[in-house]
């Protein structure tokens, strides 16, 4: 939402949260998840692991990660969408149930022309709750590694996303 700040249930920010392990004992989802933009927000963190969480759907994303590296979500139930952006280098969804769309390389306030794409993402032993393929959208991102995971891959052509990103960059007062 350009011009407004997101309201996030839990935010993990580097370097303070580098190396953090978030378990089901640490995590309590809000009673009103649709009143929050993102429930599990990560910004510029290295080596963050979340395991055994149930993350409900919210107004925007269950999980929203921007910048950083070596994120790992293990044995989580993700009832909404996952957005991985900001040239993240390394994110793994392992043994997760994903209800929504996984978007890789979507626009973020730190985007600039020529920046490295989101890369080294893997989905391993993941599924959707209804057995249908998990929708994975590729924007400014490299192809994820897929292992024992049924996905419907939607590659957004660069001739679509690049003008959109340039427009967002030029009109975004929060662009860094």
Which stretches of residues belong to each language-model region?
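Membrane-proximal basic amphipathic "stem/tether" segments
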Residues: 154-176
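Leucine-rich solenoid repeat scaffolds
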Residues: 116-161
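Extracellular beta-strand/beta-solenoid scaffold signature
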Residues: 8-42, 57-67, 78-85, 99-118, ...
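Detector for repetitive beta-architecture
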Residues: 47, 52, 69-70, 75, ...
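Parallel beta-helix/beta-solenoid
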Residues: 1-7, 17-18, 44-54
């Amino acid at each position: 939402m350009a011009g407004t700040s997101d309201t996030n249930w839990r935010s993990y920010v580097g370097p303070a949260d580098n190396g953090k392990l978030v378990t089901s004992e640490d995590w309590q989802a809000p009673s009103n998840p649709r009143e929050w933009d993102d429930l599990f927000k990560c910004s510029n963190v290295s080596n963050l692991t979340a395991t055994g969480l149930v993350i409900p759907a919210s107004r925007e994303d269950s999980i929203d990660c921007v910048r950083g590296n070596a994120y790992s979500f293990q044995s989580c139930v993700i009832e909404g969408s996952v957005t991985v952006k900001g040239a993240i280098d390394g994110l793994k969804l392992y043994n997760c149930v994903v209800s929504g769309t996984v978007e890789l390389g979507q626009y973020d306030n730190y985007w600039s022309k020529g920046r490295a794409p989101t890369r080294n993402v893997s989905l391993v032993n993941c599924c959707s709750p209804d057995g249908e393929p998990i929708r994975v959208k590729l924007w400014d991102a490299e192809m994820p590694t897929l292992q024992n995971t049924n996905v419907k891959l939607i590659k957004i052509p660069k001739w679509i996303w690049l003008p959109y990103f340039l427009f967002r960059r030029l009109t975004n007062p929060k662009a860094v």
